[in-house]
């Protein structure tokens, strides 16, 4: 996954995998201070929208994750 433009990643909300494909939901902060929520594959940005740290936005990201998991996507194990 790549950083687009002058944005810096703040947090990864989730990582999913299915048949060798990966998706990540990442919050970025741009040079202007605004936050962006991106769902990214290894090759492309699938969703890119403004993000405000509000329960509604976090619930939307969680609902997308749950919908993908119902369709066969699995959590990527985290290593520390």
Regions found by a protein language model. Give the residues of each.
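Intrinsically disordered, low-complexity and often Lys/Arg-enriched segments
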Residues: 1-10, 19, 77-80
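Intrinsically disordered, low-complexity regions enriched in Ser/Pro/Gly/Gln/His and often acidic
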Residues: 7, 11, 64-67
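N-terminal acidic leader/helix
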Residues: 8-24, 31
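A short, exposed loop/beta-hairpin motif centered on an aromatic-Gly-Thr core
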Residues: 43-56
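A short, charged, amphipathic alpha-helix used as a generic interaction element across diverse proteins
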Residues: 53-70
């Amino acid at each position: 996954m790549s950083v687009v433009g002058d944005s810096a990643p703040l947090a990864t909300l989730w990582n999913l995998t299915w048949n060798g494909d990966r998706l990540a939901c990442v919050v970025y902060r741009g040079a202007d201070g605004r936050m962006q929520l991106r769902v990214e594959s290894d090759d492309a940005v699938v969703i890119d929208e403004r993000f405000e740290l509000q329960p509604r936005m976090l619930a939307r990201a969680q609902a997308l994750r749950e919908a993908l998991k119902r369709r066969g996507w699995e959590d990527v194990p985290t290593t520390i």
